[in-house]
Amino acid sequence: METNQSNHYKNKRSKREEFISKYCNGDGIIVDGFIVDKGHPKGAEVHSITENGIIIVHNYSSGKLVTKLLARPHQIMRYYKATGREYPPELEHILELARLHNILGYNEI
C-alpha cells in the first residue's frame, strides 16, 4: 500500500484495498494512463489503468493516491474516446477482466 495517500483514501478505502489485494492479485502493472480534469477543487488527476483491471487515481499536483477503482469496461473505453485514441487490441484482456468484475459486482466495493 502506498504511503502518500489522500485523507479520503486513508479513511474510506481500506476495505477496497484489501479486496484488490486478496481477490484481484493486487494492482498489477500500469499499462496506460490519462490526465483527467473534472474541475475538482484540488485539481487534475492521473488515472492509470493496470493489467488487473484496476484504475489507480492520483492527484496530478501532489501525487497523492486518491482512490482505486475496479474498472467497468465503459470507464476504460471513455478514456480512449476522450483523447481520440484507439483502444489497443493487445489490452483486450483488461476489458474482459473489467466485464467480469462488473458482472461480479466488484466495482461496488
Where are these regions (language model features)?
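Ribonuclease/tRNase effector modules and their secretory precursors
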Residues: 1-109
